[in-house]
């Protein structure tokens, strides 16, 4: 804004979007809208103002306030559709944004909508509309069988994950609607049969749909909309009802496919059914928590599984249900941005399942404790769904191994009871599932024993080898990598204590200058106390790869645990040889390098460490084998092929292409 108080919005270069704003009085709101547009838009834009013969001094005040703008002046009111069409004709950018004069764009509003409009098959994009108090006004909209429009999330909490994932919607409100200019003009613009306002945006989106193009809601873009700020509520209601009749007559055949709403407020399942009506498949995935991608415990694998489901089946509705909401706000956004609905967790489990009765075609439950916890809910509310049990790791095996190491007495008896209960839960989950996902051939053999004929699919984690992994001479010292979430009973804390007490004293006799660096999340005071002259307790690091590519050997002699260990997958990808036990090596087809890496004897473990640390040729042989494993056995393509085959087995059509 210059010293005179005038606002210059002339684009500095070719505009990426032409913003079309129709005016009919109401200058005070329009001024706020234009000011917000100028303040919160970083990309060059063109502003096209269409004055529909405002009955007051709006046009004069606009001309006095803003410069660098294209103004279309009408002698009579052409209505919203007609005025918008004029603005589109006058615009020069490849992309149009129709913006109400009572719509206040928020910081970062434009890039997500431009991103969506550039995607194949997308015809239009709309933001999350907020009320002035910050609550949700409209998180996308659905239209029922008699043409009534229903805003998703009306007056809801904008922080709620239900309103924070992008998805296809029935239509997007022209309060802020982005569409390609050539496509808009090719369609003939807004139909002026809906003049002066209402339902022209619904009609446009239905015409896009008839061409095979979707309208996408993206909540990363946010716009505050002053509800009916450009007219009275009563006049708006009457216009809506009049134009609904026109809309229903035109689109009756498609509307017959839409659900009939009775009392939306009292029956949220109707809104849910309408929201997901066009989803070709509906998947419910249940796990302990929103995946902590910077931790182990199966979380990176679950994150990748969800990512691949969303990538391979973009037309599916994927709901991720977390049994615990721990750090959900921190870790949910990447899933939400992929179009995955995250529930972490509901405040009322029974109500949540009741509202989604018969909603899902496939339910995937990860881990035995979750299968046991949700078995009753799923049997009652989703009996029609095909069931997948994802072992992640057979927890009873970890407990069995822990029992063997326990001191005896009451604690051993407690562990034995817990082991028996977990074994029973996991066997039941295997037997009741239609198919089973597991992480290793070892787990497959157990499943075959307890459920002969059960169809299993091995889905280990995915890693991507580090390009040009550093060689022998570029590395030094030892690395211990593992999280300590379970505290004193953590497999990694037990392993570290065993390493320091039984293995490294033998190694350090010949290599006293070599340091052991310990990295991993949730380090306890008892682990911190293990620091010493040759042991550095680093703790949590944001970038483990930096450590994995500096160390010469990774060592973690696990004495109990189960499943495929993420820490060693990360070692594969970094080209870092690891030394471990038979428990630690479970699930890794190490082949002829196994004797160089695996032992359950502490003296032999020390000898393996010593040889790898000093023998360049052996180290390079092992590194080459591990990098080959990473690229051929734990690669994304192998994971996807197995996943597509598994989903086809339960009746989900393979993805197009």
What are these regions (language model features)?
Residues 96:
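Short aromatic/hydrophobic "clamp" motif used to bind/position activated sugar donors
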Residues 81, 89, 136-138, 142-151, ...:
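A recurrent flexible, glycine/aromatic-enriched loop bordering the glycosyltransferase active site
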Residues 51-60, 76:
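A conserved acidic beta->alpha catalytic loop
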């Amino acid at each position: 804004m210059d010293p005179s108080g005038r606002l210059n919005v002339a684009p500095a270069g070719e505009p990426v979007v032409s913003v079309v704003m129709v005016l009919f009085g109401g200058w005070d709101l329009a001024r706020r809208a234009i000011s917000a547009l100028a303040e919160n838009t970083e990309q060059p834009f063109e502003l096209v103002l269409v004055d529909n013969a405002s009955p007051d001094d709006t046009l004069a005040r606009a001309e006095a306030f803003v410069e660098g703008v294209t103004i279309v002046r009408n002698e009579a009111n052409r209505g919203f559709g007609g005025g918008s069409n004029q603005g589109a004709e006058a615009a020069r950018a490849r992309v149009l944004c129709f913006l109400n004069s009572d719509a206040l764009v928020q910081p970062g509003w434009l890039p997500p909508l431009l991103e969506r409009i550039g995607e194949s098959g997308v015809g239009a994009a709309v933001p999350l509309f907020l009320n002035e108090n910050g609550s949700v006004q409209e998180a996308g909209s659905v239209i029922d069988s008699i043409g009534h429009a229903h805003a998703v999330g009306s007056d809801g909490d904008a922080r709620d994950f239900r309103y924070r994932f992008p998805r296809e919607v029935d239509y997007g409100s022209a309060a802020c609607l982005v569409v390609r200019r050539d496509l808009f003009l090719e369609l003939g613009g807004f139909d002026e049969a809906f003049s002066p306002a209402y339902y022209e945006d619904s009609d446009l989106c239905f015409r896009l749909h008839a061409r095979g193009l979707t309208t996408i809601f993206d909540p990363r873009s946010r716009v505050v909309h002053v509800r009916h700020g450009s007219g009275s509520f009563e006049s708006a209601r009457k216009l809506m009802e009049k134009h609904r009749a026109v809309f229903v007559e035109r689109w009756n055949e498609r509307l017959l496919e839409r659900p009939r709403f009775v009392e939306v407020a009292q029956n949220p399942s109707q809104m849910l059914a309408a929201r997901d009506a066009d989803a070709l498949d509906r998947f419910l995935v249940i796990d302990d928590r929103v995946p902590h991608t910077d931790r182990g415990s199966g979380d990176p694998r679950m994150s990748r599984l969800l990512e691949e489901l969303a990538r391979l089946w973009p037309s599916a509705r994927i709901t991720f249900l977390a049994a615990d909401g721990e750090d959900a706000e921190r870790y949910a956004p990447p899933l939400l941005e992929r179009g995955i609905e995250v529930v972490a967790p509901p405040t009322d489990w029974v109500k949540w399942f009741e509202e989604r009765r018969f909603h899902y075609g496939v339910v995937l439950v990860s881990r035995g404790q979750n299968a046991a916890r949700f078995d009753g809910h799923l049997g009652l509310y989703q009996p029609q769904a095909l069931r997948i049990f994802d072992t992640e790791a057979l927890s009873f095996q970890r407990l069995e191994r822990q029992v063997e190491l326990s001191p005896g007495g009451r604690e051993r008896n407690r562990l034995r009871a817990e082991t028996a209960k977990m074994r029973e839960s996991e066997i039941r989950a295997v037997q009741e599932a239609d198919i089973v996902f597991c992480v290793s051939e070892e787990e497959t053999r157990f499943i075959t024993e307890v459920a002969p004929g059960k169809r299993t699919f091995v889905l280990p984690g995915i890693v991507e080898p580090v390009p040009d992994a550093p060689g022998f001479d570029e590395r030094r010292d030892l690395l211990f990598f593992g999280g300590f979430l379970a505290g004193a009973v953590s497999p990694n804390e037990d392993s570290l204590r065993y390493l320091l007490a039984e293995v490294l004293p033998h190694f350090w006799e010949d290599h006293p200058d070599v340091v052991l660096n310990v990295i991993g999340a949730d380090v306890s005071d008892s682990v911190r106390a293990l620091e010493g002259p040759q042991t550095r307790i680093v703790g949590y690091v944001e970038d483990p790869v930096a450590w994995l590519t500096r160390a010469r050997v990774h060592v973690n002699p696990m004495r109990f645990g189960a499943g495929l260990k993420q820490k060693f997958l990360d070692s594969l990808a970094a080209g870092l040889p690891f030394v471990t036990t038979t428990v630690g090596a479970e699930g890794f087809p190490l082949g002829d390098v196994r004797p160089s890496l695996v032992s359950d004897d502490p003296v032999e473990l020390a000898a393996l460490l010593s040889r790898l640390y000093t023998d360049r040729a052996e180290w390079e042989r092992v590194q080459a084998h591990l990098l080959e494993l990473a690229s051929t056995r734990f690669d994304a393509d192998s994971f996807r092929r197995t996943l597509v085959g598994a989903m086809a087995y339960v009746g989900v059509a393979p993805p197009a292409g």
